[in-house]
């Protein structure tokens, strides 16, 4: 047992080299290693890039890839028309022409913040994706709108009821949204619907000149291209005119 354990204890060879010198020599011997690793990585990258080049060359030689490259179109050709009308699509133009009549857009689309429809969701997204107020469509065959929600001022107390003259004084001045299918805004102050401040049953809509499809499309494009700040300023100016009437 002693003979077997002796080599573990007794050192056959000793040295006078200090630990500092020993580790310095070890460090010098290990210094070339990072260079070797770097060189080997470069070789691997070169091999991989060569493989990629060969693969790319093979792909270019394939008939299907060549046919696809020949059909490559420019950016404008792939995108097609870039005007507002092409991006909005026809359903929106049809809604604006058939339902609202073109001139009632500023108030209808922008949500009636004062004295307009309250409750449910805002009508701000009317023309950009449609609107459903508590399960009721905006227009049904051209009839007047009568949603089941309160108005901020006046309630549903339009002259002649919601089916004949609109939704009361609070909706859009003394006009309402009705008018027996003759347009969304039959009466109301000038500019936004009809002419003047008539108290009939949507007669203001009949006084409008007949607009062609191109004119309506141009009006819609011009309106949709306006910024939000510009539309807010228009609505504030209009509501400032209608507020004295709603307080009567």
Swiss-Prot record:
Q: Which residues, renumbered to this chain, carry the PTM N-acetylalanine? A: 2
As for subcellular location, the record says: Nucleus; Nucleus, Nucleolus; Nucleus, Nucleoplasm; Nucleus speckle
**A cellular component annotation (GO) from this entry:** nuclear speck
Instruction: Return the motif ranges for GAR motif.
Output: 194-203
List modified residues, type Phosphothreonine: 242
For biological process, the GO terms are:
chromatin remodeling
Region feature (Interaction with PRMT1): 153-206
Q: Which UniProt keywords apply?
A: Acetylation, Isopeptide bond, Methylation, Nucleus, Phosphoprotein, RNA-binding, Transcription, Transcription regulation, Ubl conjugation
The principal localisation class reads nucleus
Residue ranges, compositional bias (Gly residues) = 157-195
* Maturation and modification: Asymmetrically methylated by PRMT1. Symmetrically methylated by PRMT5.
Positions modified as Phosphoserine?
Answer: 40, 49, 64
MF annotations from Gene Ontology: methyl-CpG binding; RNA binding
Superkingdom per UniProt? Eukaryota
User: What InterPro entries does its record include?
Assistant: CTOP_PRMT1, FoP_C
Region ranges (Disordered): 151-204
Q: Does the keyword Acetylation apply?
A: yes
The keyword Metal-binding is assigned to this record:
no
SMART domains, sorted: FoP_duplication (SM01218)
The protein's job, in short, is: Plays an important role in the ligand-dependent activation of estrogen receptor target genes. May play a role in the silencing of fetal globin genes. Recruits the 5FMC complex to ZNF148, leading to desumoylation of ZNF148 and subsequent transactivation of ZNF148 target genes. Required for the tumorigenicity of glioblastoma cells. Binds to 5-hydroxymethylcytosine (5hmC) and associates with the methylosome complex containing PRMT1, PRMT5, MEP50 and ERH. The CHTOP-methylosome complex associated with 5hmC methylates H4R3 and transactivates genes involved in glioblastomagenesis.
Q: How does it assemble?
A: Interacts with PRMT1 and PRMT5. Interacts with the 5FMC complex; the interaction is methylation-dependent. Interacts with FYTTD1, SET and PRC1 complex members CBX4, RNF2 and PHC2; the interactions are methylation-independent. Interacts with ZNF148. Interacts with WDR77 and ER.
Q: What is this protein called?
A: Chromatin target of PRMT1 protein
Native organism is Bos taurus (Bovine)
